[in-house]
Amino acid sequence: MTNHNALISDAKGSIGVAVRVPNQSLFSPGGGRYISIPRKKLVQKLEADPSQTRIHTWIEAMRASSPTRTRPGNISPLPESDEEDEYSSWMAQHPSALTMFEEIAEASKGKQIVMFLDYDGTLSPIVENPDRAYMSEEMREAVKGVARYFPTAIVTGRCRDKVRRFVKLPGLYYAGSHGMDIKGPSKRNKHNKNNKGVLFQAANEFLPMIDKVSKCLVEKMRDIEGANVENNKFCVSVHYRCVDQKDWGLVAEHVTSILSEYPKLRLTQGRKVLEIRPTIKWDKGKALEFLLESLGFANSNDVLPIYIGDDRTDEDAFKVLRNKGQGFGILVSKIPKETSATYSLQEPSEVGEFLQRLVEWKQMSLRGR
């Protein structure tokens, strides 16, 4: 199963619209009960009308990012037995990383594991207020343990400084703004073969523009109850998790209206969040490749990257690993989703359990030498 990002230019508004458009539904014909928007239909809609249709299309995308087990409109929910069959089918393709732990451990023998972790929905639960997305002390200890044995990076859409304050662990690599702002440990790190600090910022020239857009969005969203604008330095996130669904159209309208004045910025979408980013070719997959190179593992066969994430933006990293045929992507999700990940975990608590098992396995391996 493969996702495709269609970068569609709205000629009138000059907005780069990055929409994840599956070529087919989640399951093969005969099982396709999870609805996806056909690529051709979505492109036609975007081209047909440079104003209202664009907004309607984004509302569809916003609804699609709020997964449900019921069909849209007046179609009744799926029978429980059908849900179970579809979930079983999905799990057969993306089995639990806990169940398959021994397989993962076997694949890592003789190789250096490098761990990549998303933050929201992976290390911390998804919460209504993004400023209160704290990770538990148990999770912090699990990440600390992993970082003791393996190079570990936090790769997030958040501002790098903010997520570092959440995680509170030195010795990690932090990649904020979807990998556009990367900084490694300030001290020499035993995992870094090059023994030099890592600092990379892919879009410095966009900072004044991003700041201006952020301030405009704060003003525009002031009267929409529940809307939250977050300046993540190299991108801006507009959270609508707490916005009444009847106001989603107004959120999309404000965002696209402001963005029409900035052709060098594009609009993407995650879990109940719209994100404004520079139109550069950089994402979490590029960040993963950059960090592997910085760690001295470019084109190395002795490395096993593991990337754990829950959102659409993590798919770029999953695809890199799948295309390289090296390492594993692990999707955090309780429901079936199209993904390039190899394995799955249901929620952050399972992520913590997986990390702890990895630490215990490494400790046993060292004792057995």
From Swiss-Prot:
GO terms for molecular function: trehalase activity; trehalose-phosphatase activity. It catalyses: alpha,alpha-trehalose 6-phosphate + H2O = alpha,alpha-trehalose + phosphate. Keywords: Hydrolase, Stress response. Its EC number is 3.1.3.12. Residues 63-85 are annotated as: Disordered. GO terms for biological process: response to osmotic stress; response to oxidative stress; response to salt stress; trehalose biosynthetic process. It is an enzyme of class 3 (hydrolase). Its cofactor is a divalent metal cation. It comes from the Eukaryota. SUPFAM superfamilies: HAD-like. GO terms for cellular component: chloroplast. It holds the Pfam family Trehalose_PPase. Pathway: Glycan biosynthesis; trehalose biosynthesis. Removes the phosphate from trehalose 6-phosphate to produce free trehalose. Trehalose accumulation in plant may improve abiotic stress tolerance. Belongs to the trehalose phosphatase family. This is Probable trehalose-phosphate phosphatase D. The gene is TPPD.
